[in-house]
Every structure is written in C-alpha cells, then in structure tokens.
C-alpha cells in the first residue's frame, strides 16, 4: 500500500468547541488527591533527590559513580556511554548501603540503576541466593534477568526466572542450583516458598520491587506481605516505580528502612521532551480507516498499536495482515512461548507492527520503536504514560498519536489535564483518508469471519475473548494475563 503525503489542515473546530464546553467539569474531575504524607520518623525518613545539579557537575561515567572497572567494561560493551539521571542519583546512594525509592519516567534506565550496585556487592562478597527482584509481568522478569546476566557476565552471575505459566519442576531444579539472582513474579515465588522443599531466602541480601505501582495495581499486595514476612530483616531494599501513590507509600513504609527517595521527574505524569504527542479526533465508524492511514504515514517505521481488549488485539492484527502489514498480536490469552516469540520477532524486525493490550505497556525494552498508536484511548493517565513510554527512549525521538472518538473525549481531556499540556491535532485530510475505505471494509469482513472461526475453535476459551467475565467471577484487570502471573 502506497504512502500518502501529509498536508497541513486547520485544527478540528468541533473538538476545540467540545473541549471548551467541558473544561470546567474536566478540571474538577481530573483532580487526583495527593498521597498521604509520610511521617518524618527516624525509621521512615524520605529525602527528595532531584536533578537540579548543573550538567558540568554531573558524573560523566559509571566509574565516577563508584562502579568498579569490570562492571564499567560491561557497561561499555552494552553501549552504556554515560549514566542516565536516575543512575547518577541512585547508584552512589545504593553503594553507601542505603534503602532507596527510585521514581523516574519510563525508559530512564532503572534496571541498571539497581542491578549495578547489587552486582558490585555480589562481586565483593559472593554467595548464592544473593538478590531477589520482583516484577509484575513475565516479560519484564525475563528482561531484567537478561540485563543482570549481560551486566554480570564478567563475574559469571547466575540468574533464575521464576514466573507463572511455566512448569514448576524445572523452576525447582533451577532454584536447587542456588543462583545468585532470582527474578520472579510474586505469585509463583510464593508457590515455591510454600511448596518447594529446601528452598528458602533466609540469607537474602538484596530485595528489589520493580514497577511497584503496577504490582499493587494487580492486587499482588497480600502476596507481597507474605513474601516480606519470610525475608530477613537485615537486607537492602530498593523500590522502583514510574509513579507514586498512597499504596506505594504504604508498601515502602512496610518494607524499607530509613529510605532515600530519588525523584527525577518533576511532574507526577512526566513524558520525555523528545516525545511528539498528537491526537486525531474522528467518528468511531471510521476508526479502522484512519488507523490504516496513519500506518501509511509512518510506513517503514516500527509501531506499537495499543488496544483495550484481547478481542480487539486479535481483530486488528488480522485486519492488518489482510492488508499486507507485518503485524503480530501480544495479549494475555497467548501462551508464554507465543508471547515471547511475538516479542522476539518484533525486536528482530521481522514484524514491524506489534498490536498489544496493556500487558506490553510496562517495562518492555524494545529500543527501536518509532511510533505508538493509541487505537483505544487508555482509561487513566498512568496507563497513557506507560504506553507512550515505549517510544522516545534513551534520548531518541519518538511519536505518539491517540485516536479519539466522540466517546473518548472526556477521558482524553483528563489525560491532558494530568499531563499539564494540550496536545496538537495531527493533520489529516478526510478525502485522502477515505481513499483507503473500500479496502479496509473488505479486510474488516475477512477479520470478522476469522474472529468467528477463532471463537468457535477455542470454545470455552473464547469466553474471555468475547469480553465475558472469567468463570470464577474474578475482577478483570487491565489485561487478564497479569492476574495469572502467580
């Protein structure tokens, strides 16, 4: 399909008019209550660290931060030329033996910020079962493990990934080999702590809770409480999160000792300066046609399309493949091997478009993403931040476009209010967009038939795809898979 040249058009007056009518109401409803203040007690002191130092005074290398030569060489090998702000602020404090709360925007280098101090401590005093990292999703757990192994290759660090959806027997064998680092989702780790003979974390030295806000969003709180009770009190604990909430504050009070807070983002809902953010305001009936138009506008670039449901993820992937796009779906109803396969194909460039539910929105390191398309507007500002954080990473530029229909306006205005910034409408010409309509309608018919066959083939499994509640009546989360991590 040929690319369509873009022409500038005036902003859609109907959207601006609707926005102005709703501004008062939006301001009221978008107000988010602040977390409860943290008492400044001796056991629970939080010191704000901000990125206000002059650039000339900032450490220029990992060696300047106190990282040993062997780990600095690993950083060089991986292409880490200079520490990121979160690494500059947190690593020296971690090397001093302090507990940390790290708050930074997505794509800021948080993993290396906690991995390097742990590896340096392990190098100084080697022992098995040295560190534990808890992550909300399987993909993030595998990614963290890969980064630990890459950074720790010079000291031959051994990692074990313990996640739900996999056979427990090989995991028990891996734990029996006493790895240095365990990276786990909370539910499956608790299974092993309760059921795997001889497995204990009594000698653990370091605990990391990564993406802590999402761990709590997914109702892992009670499981975390049980895990914390069996860990030694004399340990170092790092809590990393893109956002702060009252739940996260409660978790840090329960798990950290005299922590320091490293906060890089000045805004609760901060996006990086290299990210271009736009929207298009369109009728719902033409949503697919405008999506194809946008993909042609960004032809040859890698893109993630975010949808709200598993059903839409499947349908759009079929629609795009019918039209000749290299698209692959990623959602919670896929098997673990299928999900990892989808990610690997996208990373390798054999598929240029990933169609995903919010399971892909947090923590996945896909450096080559050029464009994020919010086919469905996210339901809250935090989800928006984490979606668009898939592009414009590590100083690179990126583009995010939200498809806003007449039914999404109020939510979108709340997101704008939280960001503190009005977005600019992406210029489109309706006549040029409608050129795609006949082929899109044909592809839609094909996708409907494929989805019907898919539902029939899957039988009971199709109940989730059709949006029904799970049989056990469990509350549905942002993505069904995330609730099955244990």
From Swiss-Prot:
Q: Name one GO cellular component term.
A: nucleus
Compartments (UniProt record): Nucleus
The EC number(s) given in the record are: 3.6.4.13
Q: Which domain of life is it from?
A: Eukaryota
InterPro entries assigned: DDX47/Rrp3_DEADc, DEAD/DEAH_box_helicase_dom, DEAD_box_RNA_helicase, Helicase_ATP-bd, Helicase_C-like, P-loop_NTPase, RNA-helicase_DEAD-box_CS, RNA_helicase_DEAD_Q_motif
Keywords attached to this Swiss-Prot or TrEMBL record, sorted alphabetically, are:
ATP-binding, Helicase, Hydrolase, Nucleotide-binding, Nucleus, Ribosome biogenesis, RNA-binding, rRNA processing
Keyword RNA-binding in the entry? The reply is: yes
Question: Residue spans with biased composition (Basic and acidic residues)?
Answer: 447-460, 476-486
Q: Which residues form the Helicase ATP-binding domain?
A: 91-262
Main role? ATP-dependent rRNA helicase required for pre-ribosomal RNA processing. Involved in the maturation of the 35S-pre-rRNA and to its cleavage to mature 18S rRNA.
Q: What is this protein called?
A: ATP-dependent rRNA helicase rrp3
- Protein's organism: Botryotinia fuckeliana (strain B05.10)
